[in-house]
């Protein structure tokens, strides 16, 4: 009897510790009375609805303020979101006991993270940084030199992290350390792949960032509302609370919203003008034919039922319909993927930083899928395939030194002079 008591005694605290760590376990809905119930049957749904609505209100308000401040502030917001996402994902597979035996090992994860950040943003923003500092000769020389050796600098930082990792390998900890190494690199791919497209969209014109992001928010809100009030038919086993009613209702609302929002956003130069540098001043530009109104006569069978015979729309609204269809039909699969991932690790949410929503990563699953599509769609079907003077100048400023640019100018002048004389 004493042996049994002595043998069982240590198991009590272990059970309590595991319970605290897994208090959000949703593997099969155990411990959660509404784990696999539809929202329409959830007795606590109104409390959950109010908490979620309150958080959504503040997030939309803060987002609107940052959009008003401009491209650079939106990029800073994306960076902050990346850091929080990486933190949540790093913590997912960490084990406190192992980390205590590996002092400084967590710091290595962040070393790789900020090295990847330097590489990605250096590639995306290099030309705009050059455009910003061009008037200052000293800064211009410094920046162009850094850009020239940017890849070598990033590679050196990565190799230093790689050597650091090898030197920290510890007996009986190899498996944990290599799993963390692989997990870190997977996080970097997930986080920085989508963010690079997101930032590229921002500087192509806030419109191409704001509209796709807004459509995901609208789709998420109306999927929740339609499922909340009308949901009866489960949609997918990975997300038991998702319903066909919510999915269809959100899809219709998202497509309609895409068409209408494109018309509203397309009227503001602040949203449609691309930003060629890293300044924060007001923008004035010719937004191009996509954002100029066109008048279309309505077919007779439609105009008979309406008080007007023609409508004025922006050509970009047709592109917005494609974005709306993707946001409502394909992008939600990013959320389903995240749901399956969380079930694999037996967690409810990636974090708890947003009341009623979970963590930052829980809000970004569909946004990541949408940002990549928006960029690819914009480059493939919206941007004209022409070699413009601006693009040539960008390549000259970035790739050539000041002396080479002067030599090019002299050579170009001679060629033009010969053409004029020859004609």
Swiss-Prot record:
Acetylation keyword on record: yes
Listed transmembrane segments: 60-80, 102-122, 149-169, 183-203, 205-225, 246-266, 321-341, 369-389
Function: May be involved in the synthesis of minor phospholipids and in modulation of IP3-mediated signal transduction.
Pathway(s) where this gene product acts: Phospholipid metabolism; CDP-diacylglycerol biosynthesis; CDP-diacylglycerol from sn-glycerol 3-phosphate: step 3/3
Primary subcellular site in the record, as a coarse category: membrane
Record-given protein name: Phosphatidate cytidylyltransferase 2
Gene Ontology biological-process entries: CDP-diacylglycerol biosynthetic process
Catalytic activity: a 1,2-diacyl-sn-glycero-3-phosphate + CTP + H(+) = a CDP-1,2-diacyl-sn-glycerol + diphosphate
EC number: 2.7.7.41
Cofactor(s) required, per the database record: Mg(2+)
UniProt GO molecular function: phosphatidate cytidylyltransferase activity
Keywords tagged on the record: Acetylation, Lipid biosynthesis, Lipid metabolism, Magnesium, Membrane, Nucleotidyltransferase, Phospholipid biosynthesis, Phospholipid metabolism, Transferase, Transmembrane, Transmembrane helix
Cofactor binding note: Requires a divalent cation for activity.
InterPro entries (UniProt xref): PC_trans, PC_Trfase_euk
Record's bilayer topology term: Multi-pass membrane protein
Entry's localization field: Membrane
Family, similarity comment: Belongs to the CDS family.
Domain of life of the native organism: Eukaryota
One Pfam family per UniProt: CTP_transf_1
Region (Disordered): 1-32
Gene Ontology CC, one term: membrane
PTM-bearing positions, type N-acetylmethionine: 1
Gene that encodes it: CDS2
Plastid as UniProt keyword: no
């Amino acid at each position: 009897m004493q042996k049994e008591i002595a043998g069982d005694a240590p198991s009590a605290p272990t059970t309590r510790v595991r319970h605290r760590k897994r208090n959000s376990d949703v593997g099969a809905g155990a411990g959660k009375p509404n784990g696999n119930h539809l929202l329409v049957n959830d007795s606590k749904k109104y409390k959950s609805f109010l908490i979620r609505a309150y958080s959504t209100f503040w997030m939309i308000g803060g987002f609107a303020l940052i959009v008003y401040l401009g491209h650079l502030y939106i990029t800073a917001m994306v960076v902050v979101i990346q850091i929080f996402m990486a933190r949540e994902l790093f913590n997912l597979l960490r084990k406190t006991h192992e980390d205590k035996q590996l002092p400084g090992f967590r710091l290595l994860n962040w070393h790789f993270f900020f090295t990847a950040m330097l590489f990605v943003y250096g590639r995306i923003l290099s030309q705009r940084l050059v455009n910003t500092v061009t008037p200052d000769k000293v800064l211009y020389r410094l920046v162009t030199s850094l850009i020239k050796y940017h890849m070598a600098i990033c590679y050196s930082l990565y190799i230093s992290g790689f050597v650091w990792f090898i030197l920290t390998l510890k007996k009986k900890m190899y498996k944990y350390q290599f799993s963390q190494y692989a997990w870190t690199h997977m996080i970097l791919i997930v986080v920085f792949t989508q963010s690079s497209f997101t930032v590229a969209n921002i500087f192509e014109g806030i419109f191409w960032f704001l509209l796709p992001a807004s459509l995901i928010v609208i789709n998420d809100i109306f999927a929740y509302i339609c499922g909340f009030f009308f949901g009866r038919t489960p949609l997918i086993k990975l997300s038991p609370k998702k319903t066909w009613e919510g999915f269809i209702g959100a899809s219709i609302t998202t497509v309609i919203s895409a068409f209408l929002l494109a018309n509203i956003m397309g009227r503001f130069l602040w949203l449609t003008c691309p930003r060629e540098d890293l300044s924060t001043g007001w923008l004035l530009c010719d937004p191009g034919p996509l954002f100029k109104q066109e008048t279309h006569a309505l077919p007779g069978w439609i105009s008979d039922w309406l008080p007007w015979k023609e409508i004025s729309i922006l050509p970009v609204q047709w592109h917005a319909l494609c974005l709306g269809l993707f946001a409502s039909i394909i992008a939600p699969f990013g959320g389903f993927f995240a749901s399956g991932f969380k079930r694999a690790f037996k967690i409810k949410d990636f974090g708890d930083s947003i009341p009623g929503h979970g963590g930052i990563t829980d809000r970004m699953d569909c946004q990541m899928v949408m940002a990549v599509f928006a960029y690819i769609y914009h480059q493939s079907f919206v941007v004209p395939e022409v070699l413009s003077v601006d693009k040539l100048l960008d390549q000259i400023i970035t790739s050539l030194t000041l002396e080479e640019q002067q030599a090019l100018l002299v050579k170009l002048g001679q060629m033009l002079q010969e053409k004029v004389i020859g004609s």
